[in-house]
From Swiss-Prot:
Gene Ontology biological process terms, A to Z: rRNA base methylation
Gene3D superfamilies noted in UniProt: 3.40.1280.10
Annotated protein name in UniProt: Ribosomal RNA small subunit methyltransferase Nep1
InterPro entries (alphabetical): Alpha/beta_knot_MTases, Rbsml_bgen_MeTrfase_EMG1/NEP1, Ribosome_NEP1_arc, tRNA_m1G_MTases_N
Family to which this protein belongs: Belongs to the class IV-like SAM-binding methyltransferase superfamily. RNA methyltransferase NEP1 family.
Gene that encodes it: nep1
Length: 223
């Protein structure tokens, strides 16, 4: 069996506008400009920061940009081109996006948002190819489905390990899962068992961690 890295962007702050703030002026005006129903748009702190103050955890929510950048980097990696990577997005509301390795995401952020809105509505996009598929599922359920032989959680308080050594560790398993938080700060909301790893003495952005993990694994499995 070919070794593959299974990368999960977990507890991602990617969600439709919650019902509790649908009538907020910041949401209503934004929806009107885009000619969409408020309940059909993706929550985005860039445009909805005033409404976010009314939400629990509002300071960390509405960050689809994190998912966008992480996916662009992962899907364009050599590891993915060599069919050695599988990527999943798990959201704060326990939805899982299955990402086909051949998916070519829009580089343009606004087009990416439109794509995510279509995905949340239709559950699969495009409907004929199903490159992206959305299912209701917890992080624990996703990990159980993958059935890995090791689970690593990237965490600022984890065991320190330089990327090169972490790559060697990952490559010693056939089906490792690496979990990266898809949120700007704070801790994971989901409870999951695994070995916590830190790659640097300071906190790093999610997409930086994704890059470091992928490249460290590439060095070990692609010759």
């Amino acid at each position: 069996m070919k070794k593959r890295l299974h990368l999960i962007i977990a507890d991602s702050e990617l969600e439709l506008v919650p019902e509790s703030i649908i009538d907020h002026p910041a949401i209503v005006n934004y929806a009107k400009r885009r000619k969409k129903k408020p309940e059909k748009i993706i929550l985005d702190s860039t445009y909805h920061h005033a409404a976010l103050r009314q939400l629990e955890d509002g300071e960390r929510r509405g960050r689809p940009d994190i998912v966008h950048i992480c996916l662009l980097n992962a899907l364009d990696s050599i590891l993915n081109k060599e069919d050695r990577l599988r990527v999943y997005v798990h959201t704060r509301n326990d939805e899982v996006i299955y990402v086909d390795p051949s998916t070519r995401l829009p580089r343009n952020y606004n087009r990416f948002i439109g794509l995510m809105e279509s995905l949340f509505e239709k559950k699969v996009v495009p409907e004929d190819l199903q490159l992206l598929r959305l299912e209701k599922k917890t992080l624990a359920e996703l990990i159980n489905e993958i059935s890995p032989d090791a689970v690593f959680i990237m965490h600022e308080n984890g065991e320190f390990m330089i990327p090169k050594h972490f790559g060697k560790l990952l490559a010693s398993f056939k089906k490792p899962v690496v979990i990266v938080g898809g949120f700007p700060h704070g801790d994971f909301r989901s409870k999951v068992e695994g070995v916590k790893i830190s790659l640097y003495r300071e906190p790093l952005m999610a997409w930086t961690i994704v890059n470091e993990v992928i490249v460290s694994y590439e060095w070990e499995v692609i010759k």
